[in-house]
């Protein structure tokens, strides 16, 4: 059974389930796995037993962090699901999942509608042009309102919703849905928890009389919306002919795949209602690998594309590296073209290294199902890849191609971490290396002065989880400092011709190097934070020593003169110097360059730069004054305020150092009703009081 499904790509769906935290994404995925017959007992997130949440912390915290890929079958079709996290600290996970999906199910909370995080993920999906269907979940919740949620899709996302289902009953009386395409009612009666069938069986009935009129109105709207966007149906519609269910379905499919509109369904995953029709919609309306455009290589001089076809040369993208308890490195890949047996040799074209596939699996959460080969259009987990990291292309040796990779933001928050014993030190290095392979937004460095290891990430929760994983998976016992902000230093003033002579004449070979440098402030851009110019004439410093001066300056820039933070925004010009035939060396000039920079930058009015975050707060009207007052007290600049269906959306730029612990303060000020999201915006000069405080701390005063 499984083999024949694998070959016919029209029956394959690679989908993601995307949502705000707590909209019920993992629960929805669990139900899908249950109804498609993979899991025998439904895992509840409340019990910490969901099959997709396979890291210990995910099960404890009830949130999903890593996108586990899972394969299941529904009505003769194969659905590969990638579970994505909705928490903003894990943008990298969402980005990488969207990059390899063909379609997605956006899950919304029926009471809250579109929330900030859903909006962030929705925009990321727009960037990768991923077709979506929407599932309005939690229809059993008090205050759930299907029509309000549909309205938020228009107001907040600016998308065109296509309502293809209506709820029957609401809150505690929610018992099923009206299918507007086939004009019938699907009901799940008396099946609240307790019943063994777990919602696996439902009744197909005529539409209840009291809802008939509403159903007819929405059916009419549905046909009008589809006909307006589809020429073939428009003619039938105007000539008054009956549009068949099959015609309507294929038109909805075309419009969904092209991203023109988004079908909307509803249900309650937790109460086991409405999940099977959503699976039918995944098959009916979301694209197969054959419906999406071919992938292109990034080499502009040699444009190439690969079709989702087994006869094409092999190409695949690695989108995640995970550490598996038994197999070690597990690389998740999406195969775009061609086919290869397990054990084949291929080339990693991004890094120009040869690689060999070991065993190949199709995954069910964290259980593996070995398969003999990989073929186009599918998602696999493979072992045996040594050099491949997230975003790398793997391809046939004779037909190289590099596929578009993914972009990852720089980390903005750091904590010092100290192993408790010598044995922990070794385990810590291994843990850091493994975790950095998995997560491109996790960076680490050694502070040269204190010798401490510093780990950096995208937010407080992100680092908490990484430290926790070191403890659990690698048994590292370590003391963790309080979160620190990743400051930078720069200069404000030009220093002309600063001279420094390095000489040492005590027994044995001496050392001699003289350099004269000019430092100027340089505007920092994404690509450029430092510029070195050599204007030495007449061989006053031999050519072979010039790069050493540059290297010395770079060394010194790693530890700023003000508070030991990396220096950026420097243009250094080597103006002149002197050397000695015997005593000069590359080392001597490196030391001279480094010392000259340190002295000159002290005179160049050094200053501190702090990371500024772009913060968005969504709050009910009545708390707006408090929220704005609080942001102002955190040195925030309010950029804009907008109304968005009963709530105010405040956009502000706030220094990261003022945002620690913000979530708790915001909850207490707004009785837990406001939510916020923040992303890194850029660096800006820190005020004097902040600079003095940071400098004092750095000097241990």
UniProtKB/Swiss-Prot annotation:
Keyword Transferase belongs to the record: no
Main location: cytoplasm
InterPro entries: EF-G-like_DII (IPR053905), EFG_II (IPR041095), EFG_III (IPR009022), EFG_III/V (IPR035647), EFG_IV (IPR047872), EFG_V (IPR035649), EFG_V-like (IPR000640), G_TR_CS (IPR031157)
CC annotations in GO: cytoplasm
tr-type G domain: residues covered: 10-290
Recorded GO MF terms: GTP binding; GTPase activity; translation elongation factor activity
Gene Ontology biological process terms in this record: ribosome disassembly
UniProt keyword annotation of Cytoplasm present: yes
Pfam families: EF-G_D2, EFG_C, EFG_III, EFG_IV, GTP_EFTU
Binding site for GTP: 19-26, 83-87, 137-140
Cellular compartment(s): Cytoplasm
Keywords assigned by UniProt, alphabetized: Cytoplasm, Elongation factor, GTP-binding, Nucleotide-binding, Protein biosynthesis
Family annotation (SUPFAM superfamilies): EF-G C-terminal domain-like, P-loop containing nucleoside triphosphate hydrolases, Ribosomal protein S5 domain 2-like, Translation proteins
Annotated HAMAP family: EF_G_EF_2_B (MF_00054_B)
Biological function: Catalyzes the GTP-dependent ribosomal translocation step during translation elongation. During this step, the ribosome changes from the pre-translocational (PRE) to the post-translocational (POST) state as the newly formed A-site-bound peptidyl-tRNA and P-site-bound deacylated tRNA move to the P and E sites, respectively. Catalyzes the coordinated movement of the two tRNA molecules, the mRNA and conformational changes in the ribosome.
Family: Belongs to the TRAFAC class translation factor GTPase superfamily. Classic translation factor GTPase family. EF-G/EF-2 subfamily.
NCBIfam families tied to this protein: EF-G, PRK12740.1-5, small_GTP
Name the record gives this protein: Elongation factor G
């Amino acid at each position: 059974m499984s083999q024949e499904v694998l070959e016919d790509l029209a029956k394959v769906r690679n989908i993601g389930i995307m949502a705000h935290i707590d909209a019920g994404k993992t629960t929805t995925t669990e139900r899908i796995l249950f109804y498609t017959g993979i899991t025998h007992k439904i895992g509840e997130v409340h019990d910490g037993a969901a099959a997709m949440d396979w890291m210990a912390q995910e099960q404890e915290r009830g949130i999903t962090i890593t996108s586990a890929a899972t394969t299941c079958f529904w009505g003769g079709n194969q659905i590969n699901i990638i579970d994505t996290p909705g928490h903003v600290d894990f943008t990298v996970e969402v980005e990488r999942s969207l990059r390899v999906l063909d379609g997605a199910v956006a899950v919304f909370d029926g009471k809250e509608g579109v929330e900030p995080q859903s909006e962030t993920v929705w925009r990321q999906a727009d960037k990768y042009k991923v077709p979506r269907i929407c599932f309005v979940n939690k229809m059993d919740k008090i205050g759930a309102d299907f029509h309000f949620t549909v309205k938020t899709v228009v107001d907040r996302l600016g998308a065109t919703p296509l309502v293809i289902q209506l709820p029957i009953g609401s809150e505690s009386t929610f018992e099923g849905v009206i299918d507007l395409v086939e004009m019938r009612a699907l009901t799940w009666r008396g099946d609240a928890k307790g019943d063994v069938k777990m919602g696996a069986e439902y009744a197909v009935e005529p539409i209840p009389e009291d809802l008939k009129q509403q159903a007819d109105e929405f059916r009419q709207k549905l046909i009008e919306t589809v006909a307006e966007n589809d020429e073939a149906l428009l003619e039938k519609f105007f000539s008054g002919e009956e549009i068949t269910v099959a015609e309507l379905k294929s038109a909805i499919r075309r419009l969904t795949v092209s991203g023109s509109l988004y079908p909307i369904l509803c249900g309650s995953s937790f109460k086991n209602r409405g999940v099977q029709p959503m699976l039918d919609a995944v098959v009916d309306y979301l694209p197969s690998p054959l419906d999406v455009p071919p992938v292109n290589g990034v080499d502009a001089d040699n444009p190439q594309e690969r079709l989702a076809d087994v006869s094409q040369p092999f190409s695949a993208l690695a989108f995640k590296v995970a550490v598996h308890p038994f197999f070690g490195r597990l690389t998740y890949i999406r195969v775009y073209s061609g086919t290869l047996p397990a054990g084949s040799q291929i080339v990693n074209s991004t890094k120009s290294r040869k690689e060999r596939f070991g065993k190949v699996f199709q995954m069910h959460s964290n259980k593996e199902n070995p398969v003999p080969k990989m073929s186009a259009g599918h998602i696999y987990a493979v072992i045996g890849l040594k050099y491949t990291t997230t975003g790398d292309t793997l391809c046939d040796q004779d037909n190289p191609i590099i596929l578009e990779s993914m972009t990852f933001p720089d980390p903005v928050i750091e904590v010092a971490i100290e192993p408790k014993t010598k044995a922990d030190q070794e385990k810590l290095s291994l843990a850091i290396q493994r975790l950095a392979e998995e997560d491109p937004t996790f960076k680490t460095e050694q502070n040269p002065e204190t010798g401490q290891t510093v780990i950096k990430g995208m937010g407080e929760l992100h680092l908490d989880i990484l430290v926790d994983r070191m403890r659990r998976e690698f048994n590292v016992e370590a003391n963790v400092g309080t979160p620190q902000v990743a400051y930078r230093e720069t200069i404000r003033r030009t220093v002309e011709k600063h001279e420094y002579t390095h000489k040492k004449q005590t027994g044995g070979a001496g050392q001699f190097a003289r350099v004269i440098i000019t430092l100027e402030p340089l505007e920092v851009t994404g690509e450029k934070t430092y510029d070195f110019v050599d204007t030495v004439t007449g061989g006053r410093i031999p050519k072979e020593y010039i790069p050493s001066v540059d290297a010395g300056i770079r060394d010194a820039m790693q530890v700023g003169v003000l508070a030991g933070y990396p220096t950026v925004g420097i243009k250094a010009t080597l103006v002149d110097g002197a050397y000695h035939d015997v005593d000069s060396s590359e080392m001597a000039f490196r030391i001279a360059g480094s010392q000259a920079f340190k002295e000159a930058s002290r005179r160049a009015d050094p200053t501190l730069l702090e990371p500024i975050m772009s913060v968005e707060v969504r709050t009910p009207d009545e708390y707006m004054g408090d929220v704005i007052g609080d942001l102002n007290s955190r040195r925030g600049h309010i950029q804009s305020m907008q109304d968005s269906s009963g709530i105010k959306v405040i956009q502000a730029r706030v220094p990261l150092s003022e945002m620690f612990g913000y979530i708790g303060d915001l909850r207490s000020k707004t009785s837990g009703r406001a939510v916020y999201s923040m992303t890194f915006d850029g660096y800006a000069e820190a005020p004097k009081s902040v600079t003095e405080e940071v400098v004092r701390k750095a000097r241990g005063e």
